[in-house]
């Protein structure tokens, strides 16, 4: 975090993984804003962050000693091509029957993630990918990771995130992927959609013993996606 170069921004943020810089990271944003508020550096809401992808609004609210952070994302984009079912099954080491038959697509509200609907949480929890093949497919289809997921009830989902050559094989919390997933669910009407905010709860990291919960929201206006955001909170260690 540093001084902004844009006059309309409060703080400039850059994000780094072990192997490279990345343009956007939601859990780092939630954690950073939490730290700024706790230390008294950030005293008003909202604030505007300068990122590699442009300016980004962040709202925060103190609630029962917990800081709730809401990070605006961008309008969704959709990749026109995706790996074949055969390629996905080879990379995830699953049978085709483990897929629901729903759309498989790379979606982005800041960074592209390949969204893959699976039939059960048991299948999700037991995934042991072929990472070299997975990374190769990410390169070929211009996406930054695989995000297999299972749709539960009441807008609850379970997911895992396997990033492309990040320096680690799996991520316990991926807000950019959760935001893309929420937009995907609304676009393809995989859930009941209403005008106004459509709110989703995504559980991630359980299979790796680092559980997290991410709140992803999509605002629909005149049956079109008008806004996306991620909500969450962090603990200071």
Regions found by a protein language model. Give the residues of each.
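Active-site proximal loop and beta-alpha junction motif in alpha/beta enzyme cores
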Residues: 1-24, 30-237
């Amino acid at each position: 975090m540093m001084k902004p170069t844009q006059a309309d921004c409060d703080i400039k943020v850059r994000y780094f993984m072990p192997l490279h810089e990345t343009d956007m990271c939601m859990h780092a944003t939630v954690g950073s804003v939490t730290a700024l508020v706790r230390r008294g550096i950030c005293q008003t809401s909202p604030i505007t962050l300068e990122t590699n992808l442009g300016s980004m609004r962040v709202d925060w609210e103190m609630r029962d000693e917990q800081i709730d952070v809401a990070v605006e994302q961008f309008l969704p984009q959709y990749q026109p091509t995706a790996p074949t079912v055969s390629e996905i099954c080879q990379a995830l080491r699953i049978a085709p029957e483990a897929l629901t038959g729903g759309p498989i697509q790379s979606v982005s509200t800041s960074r592209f993630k390949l969204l893959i609907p699976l039939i059960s949480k048991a299948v999700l929890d037991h995934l042991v990918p072929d990472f070299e093949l997975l990374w190769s497919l990410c390169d070929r289809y211009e996406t930054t990771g695989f995000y297999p997921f299972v749709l539960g009830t009441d807008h609850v989902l379970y997911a895992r995130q396997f990033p492309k050559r990040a320096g680690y094989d799996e991520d316990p919390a991926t807000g950019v992927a959760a935001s893309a997933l929420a937009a995907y669910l609304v676009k393809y009407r995989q859930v009941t959609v209403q005008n106004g905010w459509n709110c989703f709860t995504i559980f991630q990291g359980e299979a790796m013993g680092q559980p997290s919960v991410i709140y992803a929201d999509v605002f629909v206006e005149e049956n079109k996606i008008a806004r996306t955001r991620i909500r969450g909170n962090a603990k200071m260690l």
